[in-house]
């Protein structure tokens, strides 16, 4: 004769949910995580005396997905005020866009400068 052993596994989801007091005198409430928006960074283009205006418009259309009208408006702001904000992004995206613009400008032999600044 063989003795038969039976093992029963109980998982948390199998236990009946009870909202009753367990007698410990403690009330437990799950804390909701506090979420904050990530800090935002401005991507800024700076004016120089050598980069053609058409190239600046091309950069704004290519790397910031701006339409021709808005790209031209920002390019004119860069030209007249010395700098302009191209967009507001999280740090990683802002750094990537600035790096791409600077690399493309160097490859095209233009001194156009793009940097990021913390917003606020």
Swiss-Prot record:
Pfam families xref list: ClpS (PF02617)
Chain positions covered by the region annotation Disordered: 1-25
UniProt xrefs under InterPro entries: ClpS, ClpS_core, Ribosomal_bL12_C/ClpS-like
Biological processes per GO annotation: protein catabolic process; proteolysis
The protein's assembly and partners: Binds to the N-terminal domain of the chaperone ClpA.
Similarity-based family: Belongs to the ClpS family.
Chain's role: Involved in the modulation of the specificity of the ClpAP-mediated ATP-dependent protein degradation.
Name of the protein: ATP-dependent Clp protease adapter protein ClpS
Species whose genome carries this gene: Pseudomonas putida (strain W619)
């Amino acid at each position: 004769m063989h003795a038969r052993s039976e093992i029963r596994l109980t998982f948390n989801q199998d236990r009946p949910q009870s909202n009753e007091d367990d007698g410990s005198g403690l009330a437990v409430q799950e804390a909701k995580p506090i979420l904050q928006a990530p800090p935002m960074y401005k991507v800024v283009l700076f004016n120089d005396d050598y980069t053609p205006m058409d190239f600046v418009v091309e950069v704004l259309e290519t790397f910031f997905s701006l339409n021709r009208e808005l790209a031209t408006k920002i390019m004119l702001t860069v030209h007249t005020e010395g700098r302009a904000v191209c967009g507001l992004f999280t740090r990683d995206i802002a750094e990537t866009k600035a790096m791409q613009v600077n690399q493309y400008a160097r490859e095209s032999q233009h001194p156009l400068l793009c940097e990021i600044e913390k917003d606020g």
